[in-house]
Amino acid sequence: MSGAGGAGGGVGSQHRKKLRSLLEPEDLLAVLVAALAHDVGHTGQNNAFHVSSSSELAIFYNDKSVLENHHCARLFQVLKDPACDLFASLGKAQRREVRDMIVTMILGTDMGVHFKNVDRLKATIEAGSFDLSNKEDKTFVLEIVLHAADISNPCRPEPVYRLWTDKVMEEFYNQGDAEKAASLPVSKFFDRDTPNVPRCQVGFITFVLMPFYTALSDILDIGPLMTNLKHNLAIMECAAEDKS
């Protein structure tokens, strides 16, 4: 997450400094805990697989943000143990506020709400209505920063990006194998027998990441991340052309 607050200038720097000055210690605690726990207990498949396979988790969470609800629940189950209670020093009202923030941030990592949140971010920026002293606006910024960090692999330096792309694709292929075994339709790009990593990455960067990070760059200094993102897009576009 520190990458989203990288050095730079302009409007982003002003927003970043203001946000930092408005973060209370419990806000920082909530962000750190949400970042650490946002994927706890991940099963290696996505929400669509859980819903289509009628998994126990999908049934338990009524097909709604299945994994994200699961991550939240697992986190707070652990925190109920007095030996693991990170919030022991907080009062009742503070504990509730921190819990609400963490739940909001982790649920915001669901790709099912990605485009809605990007639209909200763009609309708020265009209206000039961000009020970082407002708890709702501040929590929303933290929510989108956590989500940005969660899907930031293409914003990393090329060697790191390639390494983690291979790991992500192997997870996709494992899900594709499970879909075949369950006689379910194989998700696009999840079939290891017909791999096309460059096309997968070009689509993800172009339609998901670039609009999101471009909007985010209006309120946070993420110049180095944007540079990496554009570089990695270019190398994947070249690879996609070579493969076609």
Predicted regions and their residues:
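Divalent metal-dependent phosphate-bond-processing catalytic cores, especially two-metal-ion Mg2+/Mn2+ enzymes
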Residues: 3-25, 33-244
